[in-house]
Structures are given as structure tokens and as C-alpha cells.
Amino acid sequence: MKTAASDAGRDPTCITPAVWLFVVTGRSQQEVAETISSEAAKAFALNLPAEMWASHGVQHPLGDDFSGGQDLVPQTLDEPTVLSYIKDVPLSLLKDAFLTGTPDDVIDQAAEWRDHGLRYLVARNASILRPSLRKSLASNAPFFEILRGLKKL
């Protein structure tokens, strides 16, 4: 990133390495697994580029040239089509796309990003994708625990 900034005539020291990542968390690995294997989480995978799908051994249902969410036109997809597209989404793809696990797991994953130069993380709670509204709302507690832990990194 710093090389690209320098090549573009920008001061590389003025660039803050940042990323926007979704978090799937819960009080147990079972809660995390329930969320990440939900239809809603799998539908989110349609936003991921074909290249990322291919790295997990599957073809993106919208084609090999699909570059991500900016190419997705959701109003052209009906429910049966989406359900057919997501039936083969590998959980490994979702685990690669999200920070996942218990609060301690997610904080450890964020620390790896920090150790590779990240200085600003925008964490979004995707744990609300759980099939149960009650459990979706309850996911805020471990997510807030993560936010408190991230402040200490």
C-alpha cells in the first residue's frame, strides 16, 4: 500500500492502513457455527468475488468474472434463485470472509491483522444473521465484548 501511495505521488506516512470486516461471534463455537451456516450468512457470500470462491474450490454462481458486491444487482434475484446459488457455499469461504469465533478468537484474529500493519478496523456485527431473532439480539453482548477487547490491542 505504501508503495502504491508513493508511486501515486502521495506521502506514504499519511496513509492509515484500515479495513472494514464483518464479525460472526457468539458465546460458543456452536452459536458461531449456527450463524455461519444460516441461509442469510451464505447469501452474504454472493457479495464475495469469484476469485475468493475459487480459492475454496467452488465456482461463484454468478460467473468466474464476478468481482464482488459492486456487480450484484439483488433486485434481479428471486428467493428460489438465491437459495439454489447458496446451497454449495463452503463454510471455509465464510470463515475466510468474516472474523469468526468466540470473542477471544475474534480478538486474536484482529491482532493478526494488527501485526500485519492494520491500524484502523471497522468491525460490523454479522452475528445478527442468526435464524432466531432472540439469538440475533443476544449476539450483541459478545460483540460488545469484542469491541472492548479491540480497544486494548
Residue positions per predicted region:
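Structural motif
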Residues: 116-117
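Positions that flank functional sites
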Residues: 20, 128-129
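C-terminal helical cap(s) of enzyme catalytic domains, especially alpha/beta-barrels
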Residues: 1-4, 130-153
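An alpha-helical appendage that flanks or caps ligand/catalytic pockets
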Residues: 3-112
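Short secondary-structure boundary segments
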Residues: 125
